[in-house]
């Protein structure tokens, strides 16, 4: 007799379909979420809908590898979830993509970055639109300052009721202010998506707590990044802490734990995933720092050397300085002192900084640290008991690809091919 298919069977089939293309499944849910939000924005005001809401939607759908959503999914699957929780996991993944939009749009404003994913950054796009309408020339960009990054939102509030003509607001200033609002809208939509999702009663509290913690950590990391620039922080330990908060936890660790919480993982399993995610997440940000200096702009979508021009105290920079000081290398220190924080730094001067990173051994030390962190990350998976070995292999491969490390086979299986994650191409 033919067995009657149950709801559990259908849920299993849905989960397996997502397994085959997690990014595609996240895209489909994002389409649904954004469609509803765009309708709400247009109903509030047509101009706002076109200028801000549609840009948020295009930015969110226009790039990235859906990294955070993939970690939610494989965290869920490794812990035995799927079926009834698949829909909730995909909505969480969509919400995380909107948080990423907020983070990248705001980051570009604070850094004065002109490009994102090989295209004009959102603030630059708005500036270009309104500069053309008003006939304004874009002023020469000066070095970004800590104070301006913090105060921009307040200045917009003070002048929002006045037109560009009466307030003297330039297209440059308007573009930055509009981008701040776009990032705010993306974060609001992310929160709405989480709040509107039906989670299992046993997981709801844990997922919401992880979500709240993640948002605070992300903002704290961005503040430390700004603070490090204005104070010229030289501490490798502080650089690591900034990297953990700004990117590592919300990119890898927290999404993994959200998936595990949805699946009802026990403390031991959640602890292993936390440690694995923390190591891979830090390696991810350190690899991003490496790409920011040595990456090919054609592949990363961002100009090479901008971290140097902005004076960011990355782990790479702080280690190079510490090694130069220990060796008494005044020449290397002179190159770093002259270059870091110079917004008009030439390509030749950037090359000299690259040479210092190599000659001091900072680049090699960073590459070794990335590989070590990747190895530690996947080592934490070795003791996990799972009913789905294929899911464990996928997670193993994703962790190593995210870390920018060389792939190798997980215990008990062949390596799974995962596209290498180019952080500077939109994942940060």
Please state what every model-predicted region is:
Residues 1-428:
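All-alpha prenyltransferase/terpene-synthase fold signal
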